[in-house]
Amino acid sequence: MDDIRKTALDRFRLYLERRQFSAHTIVSYSLDLRLFFTEVAVPLAQVSFREIDRFVDQQHQDGRAWATINRRLNALKHFF
């Protein structure tokens, strides 16, 4: 993960802590974002619905449960 994404993830964790999300949610959302960052190669400022839709499709094809996919989408919603 590059420095920009690492900094963004650190700031996101602080945001979640300030909003008093549970420790479990903070860990889960952080892992979800790391996965998204790994699978989506475009710069953060250029992430669009298309990349998120492809990410969801790939998660579904990989056999992820809809509850997991929806949690990952929720993490992305809070991040962006």
Model-derived regions: residue spans:
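A detector for short, charged/polar N-terminal pre-domain segments
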Residues: 1-6
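N-terminal core-binding DNA-recognition domain of tyrosine recombinases/integrases
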Residues: 10-80
